[in-house]
Amino acid sequence: MANKAEFKTSLLRMFRARIPFISVRSIERARVLETVQQLAEEINIPIYVHSLSQGTTDIKSKKMVNDDRSVAGGLDYAVQNISQRQNLTFVFTEVSDIEDDNLVSRHLYDGVVQAIERGGSICLITTKSIWPQLQRLGMTVALDAPNEEEMLEVVKECVTPYKGSMPLEWEEADYKMAAAILANMTKIEAENVLATQMAKGSLTKDDIKELSNAKDKLFSDISGLEKVKIDPSALSVAGLRGLQHWLDNQKQLLTADLKARKLRPPRGVLLVGVPG
């Protein structure tokens, strides 16, 4: 897995090497396409993106070049253009049934073979496994959820535009704390959490604590674990006075910025009860 900077570097090398088939493992299509667009502008290569909602478009100009929204139609258009022009790159965002040997995967396989001969590249954004015979024609790269550094940029992009229109009490340390809390969420999830907090018309230091509670609304129960909602009066658990005393003593360490030591503070304490 890779953060955005590492992902961009790896993808840049693959584009320059004209790898015929690139599979991108990510659940965040928008972040992947954002990076692809940056690379298209930086190295000045033609890149086209196919989606079920817009058909095939030029990623730089956003101009539609083929209005056929079906995957088969998009592949036909890509293969036709790759056979006529060299060094073209096509990105497909929604291709299903590629895990096994079937009509879709073989259609894609044929397109990649054409790309090999013409210096083209077909890129696939997916979270699924890929038919092994197809995968062997290319390479795979993955994009992680935003880390703290990238999340800090996301937080500032969401909050700072409202600096003059609503009361904002956050300082640099508060932005960093919010980024640490929201790290490893998807970008859209973090933006939704922040938008929900700002919807009340202000952003105070107390809202930092509310970010953790807002995250609970994004996640359902994990298999084997059940989230139990309790009120503050029920937090007194017998036999844990020693733990509470230790946590009070270690509070500064648990909430400090430990990036210089390549450590991150714990997110909480998990109490496990054993029946009997």
Feature names for model-found ranges:
Residues 2-28, 53-62, 139-140, 144-145, ...:
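AAA+ P-loop ATPase motor domain of ring mechanoenzymes
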Residues 18-19, 43-46, 86-87, 118-121, ...:
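Short glycine-/polar-rich loops that comprise or flank the Walker A/P-loop
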Residues 30-34, 57-58, 99-101, 130-133:
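Short, charged/polar "capping" segments at the starts of alpha-helices
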Residues 33-45:
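P-loop NTPase Walker A phosphate-binding motif
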Residues 36, 127-145:
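Short regulatory helix/loop adjacent to the ATP-binding pocket of P-loop NTPases
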Residues 49-112, 121-125:
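Conserved P-loop NTPase "ATPase switch" module shared by AAA+ and STAND
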Residues 93, 114-122, 263-269:
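AAA+/SF3 P-loop NTPase mechanochemical coupling elements
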